[in-house]
Each structure stands twice: as C-alpha cells, then as structure tokens.
Amino acid sequence: MNYKVVEKFVSINGEGLKSGQLSVFIRFAGCNLNCNYCDTKWANEKDVKYTLMTEKEILSYIKETGVKNVTLTGGEPLLQDGIVELLNLLSLDSTLRVEIETNGSVSLENFLNFKNAPSFTMDYKLPDSSMENFMKTSNFKFLNKKDVIKFVVSSLKDLKKAMDIITEFNLSKKTNIYISPVFGRISPETIVDFMKDNKLNDVTLQIQIHKIIWNPNKRGV
C-alpha cells in the first residue's frame, strides 16, 4: 500500500501528553473537514505535493531516526487508504509509541485491536470551527487515560460548549482533557479565568510550544 506523505521530520511534540518530548512526525495529505482556524490547510489542498511511501518505507524512516515517539497526523490520518496495515506493522515494534492525531469525525472502533495499540489525541470541533456537526460523540467510549480529547477554542462561546460536553459525557473520568487556544484569537489568560470561574478540575490548558519556539507558520517543526 502507498501512502501520501507530505511531511516527515523529527521535532519536539508541541502539545499533548508527550509535549516537549522528541517525536518523529508523519504527516499525510487530505482531510474531510475544513476548520477555519486550521494551521495545516496546505496539506489538504488537492494539488499538494506528496511522496508516495509504503508502510515498510515509513517504518524504515522511523527506525532510522532513532526516535521512539511516533506522531501520525495530517490532514486526517485515519482516512488514509490502508492505514490499518500501517498501524499493524508499527504495532509489531514494541519499542515504538504511536500517537494518532485525529479530527473527531472518524470512528475509532476499527483502530483499537492492535497488540501495541496507538494512543489518540482526538479533537472535538467546537461551534467557531463550523465543523461541530461532523463530530462523533460515540468515539468518547473508546478513549481511556492514555488518550487525549482536545478542545480548540476561539471564544467564550467555544469554552462554554467545551464545558457542556465535558460535563454531559463525564469526560474527565474517562480520558485526559486539554483546552487549547486558537493562536491569536483568544488569550490563554481568558481561558484560565474561565477555568477558575467554573471550577474546571482535571482540565489542562495547553499552549502549542512549537509556535513559541519557532515562527507559528514554520513547517517541519
């Protein structure tokens, strides 16, 4: 199987449970959503340049880096043709810790039964993204404490909706919850004040540290 890879690189993980740790990133082309704040829209364009790589070539590249954390991202990695075959191959290497960044619109059910199963960082798209109608709340039951559900917020309206979802589905008992500001649209201070005012326990404010270290628009970091 060939996969459309638009980027592959080693950097620190800018967010999530492994924030600040080295990771090897594999970014795939194409996404089924069109979030208005997306910082990788270029990877979803029809004419984006990509390299076709087999699962064995991807694994070989990962092993050559010597990095154990692996982040599959996009685009939407779970929509890649043959992604189960790639995940199965990666799962056979017990030294690798595979994380999948997924947008919340694809069912996770078919991606759980691996010996060395990947972890998920799953978005829940909020109203300001204009993509909330595509969210699959049925995915919540598949998440556990090695996973993350991420709420990317642009406004107080988004924060209130995130709080409603966290409460309705009792998410803090199931998985890790991160709230991340859309860069340049809402201040971290506003989020902290909201968390304090609403007693949001077991919720983590996440700042994308790669956008602090490098230019926010820089690729390959």
From Swiss-Prot:
Keywords for this protein: 4Fe-4S, Iron, Iron-sulfur, Lyase, Magnesium, Metal-binding, Queuosine biosynthesis, S-adenosyl-L-methionine
GO biological process terms on file: queuosine biosynthetic process
Keyword Lyase: yes
Residues binding substrate: I12, N13, G14, R27, T73
Pfam families attached to this UniProt entry: Fer4_12 (PF13353), Radical_SAM (PF04055)
Cofactor(s) recorded in Swiss-Prot or TrEMBL: [4Fe-4S] cluster; S-adenosyl-L-methionine; Mg(2+)
Superkingdom of the organism of origin: Bacteria
Keyword Metal-binding: yes
Residues that bind [4Fe-4S] cluster: C31, C35, C38
Entry note: cofactor: Binds 1 [4Fe-4S] cluster. The cluster is coordinated with 3 cysteines and an exchangeable S-adenosyl-L-methionine.
EC number of this enzyme: 4.3.99.3
Residues annotated for S-adenosyl-L-methionine binding in this entry: G75
GO molecular function: 4 iron, 4 sulfur cluster binding; carbon-nitrogen lyase activity; magnesium ion binding; S-adenosyl-L-methionine binding
Domain Radical SAM core: 18-216
The reaction(s) this protein catalyses: 6-carboxy-5,6,7,8-tetrahydropterin + H(+) = 7-carboxy-7-deazaguanine + NH4(+)
Enzyme class: lyase
HAMAP family: QueE
Assembly and binders: Homodimer.
Protein name (database record): 7-carboxy-7-deazaguanine synthase
Gene encoding the protein: queE
